[in-house]
Amino acid sequence: MSSGGLLLLLGLLTLWAELTPVSGKNRPEFCNLPADTGPCKAYEPRFYYDSVSKECQKFTYGGCKGNSNNFESMDECRKTCVASATRRPT
């Protein structure tokens, strides 16, 4: 295979890995924790995975402590915790 073909294959595999959602079996345990603002009083918009709705939701983080179900962006939350409802086992 030519180096151009290998480069294309590598690019496609990288894209596939980025776009493939996390399966429920592989979802980190902390994704099931509730949103936790923590004891501090800052106002930081953040996102958490809501295991009931199975979607990432916005919440206000106080700036300290809390838990690991706390993401700076919706995209980061989705990449880490959202499982695809349409994904079929292989």
Swiss-Prot record:
Disulfide bonds: C31-C81, C40-C64, C56-C77
Protein's name according to its UniProt entry: Kunitz-type serine protease inhibitor bitisilin-1
Superkingdom: Eukaryota
Chief localization: secreted
Compartments reported by the entry: Secreted
Signal peptide per UniProt: 1-24
PROSITE patterns per the UniProt record, alphabetical: BPTI_KUNITZ_1, BPTI_KUNITZ_2
Pfam families: Kunitz_BPTI
GO CC field: extracellular space
Reported tissue expression: Expressed by the venom gland.
Role summary: Serine protease inhibitor.
Keywords (A to Z) from UniProt: Disulfide bond, Protease inhibitor, Secreted, Serine protease inhibitor, Signal
Matching SUPFAM superfamilies: BPTI-like
UniProt-annotated site: Reactive bond for trypsin, residues: K41, A42
Residue intervals of the BPTI/Kunitz inhibitor domain: 31-81
Family the entry assigns: Belongs to the venom Kunitz-type family.
Annotated Gene3D superfamilies: Pancreatic trypsin inhibitor Kunitz domain (4.10.410.10)
GO MF term set: serine-type endopeptidase inhibitor activity
